Amino acid sequence: MDFRTACEETKTGICLLQDGNQEPFKVRLHLAKDILMIQEQDVICVSGEPFYSGERTVTIRRQTVGGFGLSIKGGAEHNIPVVVSKISKEQRAELSGLLFIGDAILQINGINVRKCRHEEVVQVLRNAGEEVTLTVSFLKRAPAFLKLPLNEDCACAPSDQSSGTSSPLCDSGLHLNYHPNNTDTLSCSSWPTSPGLRWEKRWCDLRLIPLLHSRFSQYVPGTDLSRQNAFQVIAVDGVCTGIIQCLSAEDCVDWLQAIATNISNLTKHNIKKINRNFPVNQQIVYMGWCEAREQDPLQDRVYSPTFLALRGSCLYKFLAPPVTTWDWTRAEKTFSVYEIMCKILKDSDLLDRRKQCFTVQSESGEDLYFSVELESDLAQWERAFQTATFLEVERIQCKTYACVLESHLMGLTIDFSTGFICFDAATKAVLWRYKFSQLKGSSDDGKSKIKFLFQNPDTKQIEAKELEFSNLFAVLHCIHSFFAAKVACLDPLFLGNQATASTAASSATTSKAKYTT
């Protein structure tokens, strides 16, 4: 039932939808470039201006072969009316053009059967005479357990046999034909067409979900419990699809990937438009939803939706996507991108059953734990974080931190071009300098002290330098960011991808500290 266009921007297929406490029912999903449509079947009048049906009255005559030409399912034992489950080709019901699979039978010859059990309705139809007048209304959300066909092109062969038993979950059709005085011999072609109104079964929009800044999840909200072959999509305004149940695991993955692709494309296009209004050093590199794991294990909701953005020098953590310039000033948290550490978690590092996770360690040493839905989402985040870090390091070129050496106030500059420079804070006199390549190892006490192990270029001996910082994690992460940027400079593929951004970033004004030797 599904297909994709060459650009993979559209997809259509049949799924089940569970909306609240209702039984799942069949819907059609249609994915367009910027919207997800959920459609349900309804019967509408198409003569003149289309309008939706309420109750319709249908009169059909019994035939010698095939009877009324319909089968039924359901009943009060399942808290639903009896519904038409099959319509025989070239039989009375089919030729009338007024009866459809999914029609709930409300009255039979004026007898109210809305709350009748299946067998009771069967008996009423068997004893209805040669002509029966049905009051029907299309049951748009027929429970999936009825397994109704989506259209009238189903095999339901006519028969003149009768059956004495019926089941509400099986098609009761053959035993509806019994009528002792039936002498009808009219041919199918002699059945008159219905004058006046003409009805058709169509797919009608039930819910429309704009994809820009929307999010989707396979997990039960707030937990690490994944639904089997099911997901939901939530629009930026909070409108939710309900739980969409796919027919197979493969089908579910296809839908999720297609939705993720369209959301990603919309986000990239939106970022380009927004970046026109921001200077070079304030460009957005990434925007997207994830779920943050609460640090308090006693919380009822372990995970909560979080919107992350990488812009300029900062990682922003929002409760909702920023729309205006003012929104960017109201982030829940903000971090300097070169002073934090991002780690993609292996299976052995995961805290629960969620698979695609990463952590961000802040400049204060706080660990933030995040989860995304797809492996491709995780890869996209990792690339974006590397890009944002590289661009910011390339822009600032150097960073200086206050430190203490043997009770003396010093400064340590991490310079992208020259490496490490330690100088006296008062006199600016340089005590020592080393290139990045000379750093052979380091260790820290987790509180304030870092011991650097540098190799002397002349003696080849290892020289230990210990410094004390008030912001240990910020320094460690900054060193890591500068090293990562150095490594990225050796990767032709990375540099090729960043050529445009790097050129723009290098044109920005940068300031460097001056030293005396």
Swiss-Prot record:
Q: Name one GO molecular function term.
A: actin binding
Domain (PH): give its ranges. Answer: 283-390
Q: Which CDD domains does the protein's record reference?
A: PDZ_syntrophin-like, PH
Membrane spanning segments where?
A: none
Tissue specificity as recorded in UniProt: Brain specific. In CNS, it is expressed in the perikaryon and proximal portion of the neuronal processes. Strong expression in the hippocampus, neuron-rich dendate granule cells, and pyramidal cell layers. Highly expressed in neurons of the cerebral cortex. Also expressed in the cerebellar cortex, deep cerebellar nuclei, thalamus, and basal ganglia. No expression in muscle cells.
Q: How does it assemble?
A: Isoform 1, but not isoform 2, interacts with the dystrophin protein DMD and related proteins DTNA and DTNB. Interacts with DGKZ.
Q: What is this protein called?
A: Gamma-1-syntrophin
